């Protein structure tokens, strides 16, 4: 992807929860961007040859000298700069302005009034005030505020509690915004970012699925040559897109290993083998390891221990199959850009203990002695989906709800047994089927069933019975960091409950989880 990455837009991260959202908004414009720590090395910066820089927000306060600052050389680089929230405040302080903590903090919506003309905000408005001023509805999240402009800057917008809500030095193409244009609550936020990125930075807009695929194929062929590549295919979005991309790039040089853990969704193994094996012609080695996984999980109830056992057992099975293939030189993984960002951020943080391992193939042993191939490591999840569609993968596969790496193992709140997995598989399939039938599936972010290890009395015909409880979970979220429980219609839930109790032997009661995140997590374990 070298040509598409020429002169990218850089985002320097000061720790904001919205940093990745900024990058996703920039990518939506067809512009390639990368996220780097705020203290990026000058030599590395020069090699990247960026077209412009965005300074993100962050949780710190610039009123403390020890807190993060942008490299001072950045302000002498002659590149367009945009500081957002904390990014604006550190820009102001480092260029000679003043920032103070405010007693009138702003969190949430605010009405922004534009001042005169600025290249960044001109002709962008939600409505007009009585005096003719342009007004914008924006999203604020700050306690500090700029109280004195740096030399050369002018005020470009204000709110009731922040007289300097935006500033600009047009001659040096430096801009600061106290609000967050990257969040959807700022209605014109994408237009504002586009004004900076495309109009001011003159960024190239060639970052499209077609171009991404073309560049990726060229890079794969250049790296791999005539050597063979091994991929652990799970049926999830990331590994599916990698499989389709590699198959298009190198054809029969790709070998996939699919491990049936016994903890997959109903008919999932058959669907994966049919789609990639029979229809696409990819060579797949299918391994039924259900007994091995269930034996390893016998007697284990601790969620974290279950995860470790499932991960360790997968590695053993995968390694065993890989050792049989003596002509493999490469191991492909479905690493995506958020994984890369997380790993980079954690590696520079002494307090960080655990990096989330990549589903299924994360932590494969060094004894494989294979070279690593990560063809989608520069893509966000939504970009992976767009590439998948462009490669011809079915919409329902590409937009399937997330499924945890340990599978049903962490949706059975007890020791994992085949009986429990079979009950849960059937109940979950009914829930998902009815969501599709009611055209609700793609309106929610994630839905699944959970097996509860308690028995509840029920009545079937003239008899009483004690059977298990199934809990249904459905959430709506943008980033999976926070989530609302989905307010599905009661008659719909009643229909699903009735079907599960009548069609799944061993279930006497169905409940619905109405917990948000926080305080709950999306998964139960």
From Swiss-Prot:
Annotated binding of ATP, by residue: 234-240
Top-level EC class as recorded in UniProt: ligase
Recorded GO CC terms: cytosol
Entry-linked SUPFAM superfamilies: Adenine nucleotide alpha hydrolases-like, Class I glutamine amidotransferase-like, GMP synthetase C-terminal dimerisation domain
Pfam families reported for this sequence: GATase (PF00117), GMP_synt_C (PF00958), NAD_synthase (PF02540)
Pathway field: Purine metabolism; GMP biosynthesis; GMP from XMP (L-Gln route): step 1/1
PROSITE patterns: GATASE_TYPE_1 (PS51273), GMPS_ATP_PPASE (PS51553)
Active site: 85, 180, 182
EC id: 6.3.5.2
CDD domains for this protein: GATase1_GMP_Synthase, GMP_synthase_C
Domain GMPS ATP-PPase: start-end pairs: 207-400
Catalytic function, reaction form: XMP + L-glutamine + ATP + H2O = GMP + L-glutamate + AMP + diphosphate + 2 H(+)
Ligase is among the record's keywords: yes
Protein keywords: ATP-binding, Glutamine amidotransferase, GMP biosynthesis, Ligase, Nucleotide-binding, Purine biosynthesis
Ranges for domain Glutamine amidotransferase type-1: 8-206
Gene3D superfamilies assigned: 3.30.300.10, 3.40.50.880, HUPs
GO molecular-function term, one example from the UniProt record: ATP binding
Record carries keyword ATP-binding: yes
Subunit structure: Homodimer.
Function: Catalyzes the synthesis of GMP from XMP.
Protein name, as recorded: GMP synthase [glutamine-hydrolyzing]
Organism encoding this protein: Legionella pneumophila (strain Paris)
Gene: guaA
